[in-house]
């Protein structure tokens, strides 16, 4: 049996899972798929292929599904792999990086369909209050080259060299099982998705472990396949709710309130701008719910 296991979490992933699974199985790693109550034939396709499958009757969220996968397979090294990612190389460089002194895990290089590295996504710095404030207030979109955003998204980083990093993307991320156990797994409070992998990396570093980026390990990544399935309002609520949960866990209470205030202000700015562009009150209503969520957090302190 391989000492590497692969966990793939699916949610309405029938169109992508075939190519992902073919590459995962070809790697020789033990593979388990955890499906979060897909309705598009994903489960039927997985059963047809005879893959090891946990088919949830309800959506457990990404973190919950990953934790289920870890409980199912016992390999000492576990790769988290998105269903829209296709492994293009050996996984051995990732395993070797996991064996470096004090290493908790390693992420590989993600490339788009044209083979271009996904700079700004595959490795990031851990979010700071300043980074999230600028994000909430639209300043990163209006001035993407600002120093805070350049550091957060690692826009000046050399993707051709191995390096210690703060936050490899969870789409192609190998973790030592012992570290997952020590940290108690991913935080299932980040439901159904977003920021759970960021929080996990933050907790890894708080424990004094290191994380690495390994360019020799490569996967082609489409990205965002499940996001369009969410209605605009729920997409915004989930993303901002997870952002606020991360901020409450990792920032000083004063800085958490600053982030909350920025989200309130930014929600009104975004709502007005998008409603004007689309000539619809729907974005304003959606961002109004986000502002309400952040406002409650501002006054409750969590």
Show which residues each predicted segment covers.
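A conserved acidic beta->alpha catalytic loop
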Residues: 15, 23, 35-44, 58
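N-proximal low-complexity "stem/linker" segments adjacent to membrane-targeting elements
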Residues: 1-23
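Short, flexible, basic/aromatic active-site loop/helix in glycosyltransferases
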Residues: 125-165
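A short, conserved alpha-helix in the catalytic core of glycosyltransferases
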Residues: 158-161, 166-185, 189-218
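Non-catalytic, C-terminal membrane-associated alpha-helical segments of glycosyltransferases
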Residues: 233-242, 248, 253-302
């Amino acid at each position: 049996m391989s000492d590497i296991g692969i966990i793939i979490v699916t949610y309405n992933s029938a169109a992508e899972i075939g190519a992902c699974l073919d590459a995962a199985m070809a790697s020789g790693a033990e593979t388990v798929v955890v499906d979060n109550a897909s309705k598009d034939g994903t489960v039927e396709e997985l059963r047809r292929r005879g893959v090891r499958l946990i088919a949830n009757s309800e959506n457990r969220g990404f973190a919950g599904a990953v934790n289920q996968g870890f409980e199912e397979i016992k390999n000492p090294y576990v790769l988290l792999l998105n269903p829209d990612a296709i492994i293009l190389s050996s996984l051995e460089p990732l395993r070797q990086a996991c064996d470096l002194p004090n290493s908790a895990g390693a992420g590989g290089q993600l490339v788009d369909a044209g083979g271009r590295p996904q700079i700004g996504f595959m490795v990031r710095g851990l979010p700071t209050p300043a980074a999230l404030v600028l994000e909430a207030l639209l300043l990163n979109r209006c001035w993407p080259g600002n120093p805070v955003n350049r550091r957060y998204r690692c826009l000046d980083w050399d993707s051709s060299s191995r390096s210690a990093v703060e936050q490899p993307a969870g789409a192609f991320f190998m973790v030592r099982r012992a570290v997952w156990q020590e940290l108690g797994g991913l935080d299932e409070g980040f439901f159904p998705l977003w920021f759970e992998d960021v929080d996990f990396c933050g907790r890894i570093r708080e424990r004094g472990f290191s994380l690495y980026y390994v360019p020799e390990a490569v996967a082609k990544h489409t990205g965002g396949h499940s996001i369009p399935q969410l209605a605009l309002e729920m997409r915004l609520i989930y993303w901002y709710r997870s952002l606020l949960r991360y901020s409450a866990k990792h920032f000083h209470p004063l800085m958490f309130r600053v982030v909350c205030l920025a989200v309130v202000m930014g929600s009104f700015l975004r709502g007005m701008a998008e409603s004007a562009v689309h000539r619809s009150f729907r974005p304003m209503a959606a961002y109004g719910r986000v502002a309400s969520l952040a406002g409650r957090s501002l006054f409750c302190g969590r």
